[in-house]
Amino acid sequence: MSKRSNRSNNKNNTNKFNIENWEPKTELGRKVKDGEITDIDQILDKGLPIMELEIVDALLPDLEEEVMDVNLVQRMHKSGRKVNFRVIVAVGNRNGYVGLGQGKSQEVGPAIRKAVDAAKYNLIKVRRGCGDWGCGCGRRHTVPFKIEGKMSSVSATLIPAPAGVGLAIGNVGKTILSLAGIADVWSMCSGQTQTTINFAGAVFDALKQLSSVKSSEKDLKALGVID
């Protein structure tokens, strides 16, 4: 049984992270609390592993959460049939940062919390620009160039689109791209895209691949890319 959801779990003031109450357990966490690190890019650009969720909460306080899928998973165990909920969650600040995660538990609430935590640990920085040569607006509204991502049987290709086109992709892709701060894109998708975990994974992989493409500073500037 699978249930898709676009329910937003935006943080409200009552759940706002209080850095003063945080006791970091890692050197990276201590640098964040002490103010030595003030920008998430100082971590992501160096490929440093995020081992404490509070690092993300402190540096990206405007992060939003979207539950995309709640799936009931059954498996046989020697003690009988075991039932778990598997939840897929995306997080993002709608301005260049997005994460994807899944969580499993016998109850929906704990599964959602696990998925949110996993998405924060998987947070990435997304390259954006104006990659459609017919547009030339110079704003960061689309992907800077054509890129492909894969997950299991699903392949998702994202193509730059002019401003105003919107997100020409399935709802799962729309959720991830909008959380990443991308407003316009063409797409070509194949495989079992009705499987949320694979479709979401393919789109997320495409966004990760954007940063692995080597381009000259001149070309990136022409595409309006800001790393």
Swiss-Prot record:
Residues 1-22 are annotated as: Disordered. GO terms for molecular function: rRNA binding; structural constituent of ribosome. Residues 63-126 form the S5 DRBM domain. Residues 7-18 have a biased composition (Low complexity). InterPro entries: Ribosomal_Su5_D2-typ_SF (IPR020568), Ribosomal_uS5 (IPR000851), Ribosomal_uS5_arc (IPR047866), Ribosomal_uS5_C (IPR005324), Ribosomal_uS5_euk/arc (IPR005711), Ribosomal_uS5_N (IPR013810), Ribosomal_uS5_N_CS (IPR018192), Ribsml_uS5_D2-typ_fold_subgr (IPR014721). The N-terminal domain interacts with the head of the 30S subunit; the C-terminal domain interacts with the body and contacts protein S4. The interaction surface between S4 and S5 is involved in control of translational fidelity. With S4 and S12 plays an important role in translational accuracy. Belongs to the universal ribosomal protein uS5 family. PANTHER family: 40S RIBOSOMAL PROTEIN S2, RIBOSOMAL S SUBUNIT. This is Small ribosomal subunit protein uS5. The gene is rps5.
